Amino acid sequence: MLAMVRDTGYNLVLVVHILAVVVAFAPAFVHPFLVRQTRSHDLADRFQIISLMQENGQRIYAPALAAAGLLGFTLTGMSDQLYQLSQLWLWLSAGCWLAMNGLLHGLILKAEKQMANGDTSAQKRAEIGSGVLSLLFILTLILMIFKPGF
């Protein structure tokens, strides 16, 4: 069983999976700082910076999050039955991934778009969404490392 998990094809998919995770979650940690740093800029510049953040979220970060989960499912399928979705850690990780996608698409990207259009009240929603997304990411990371139920 472990031979399949450690073979070159599996390892290549694992590298791309980890890379997708890094790309997907970079803004969850960086964007709150960028938003605070834009406060010293005039409103037009501030809205332009936030607009770029939102566009990158749709073009780069959201697809990376989707790819990270799909590659995770691919790794499960490549594991020669070593890992199965019936295992607690994978089931919970999949649930976290779905929740993170819902947060990103349903709250964070929408709030960033509203902020880019001048709605300063949306900043709090974006910050809360990013915070919850970060916590879900940490939970998923713990699940992936400790694998409860494996």
Which residue ranges define each predicted feature?
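Polytopic transmembrane helical bundles with strong interfacial aromatic enrichment
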Residues: 1-150
